[in-house]
């Protein structure tokens, strides 16, 4: 017989969705990235920034370009999608210096891309980022997935082609 004093009980918050539960936001995200990742990987090529990336339960996936702490990021939210270049090293000053260096080329970069970008130095946080956002799409709406995946693929590839060369000059 088991001694009741040896029993362990685990409590679970009924208000929190189980990440493996069908219909949870985690399952939805993994399904979206499973759909989108091949499109993103194809845009970047066989050995590209996203070649070693797997579907995730998070609302983001990162692609890398060979400079530690700096990366491309695809974000899929319930109200928008974003493509980002992130300066996310552990050293805040290095992130700000890299961002500031890139910002000196803002006009050239935006001219080459044919659009204005969002430049977020993030003075109150460690990281900095440059991004573009696609509004009026929702990860929960599967009919938006192709548009979102193409947006992620196209813009992270454009960022890789246009922005990353400016970063590699100073931070390789």
Question: What are these model-derived regions, one by one?
Answer:
Residues 9, 35-38, 139, 169:
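Hydrophobic transmembrane signal anchors and adjacent membrane-proximal interface regions, especially
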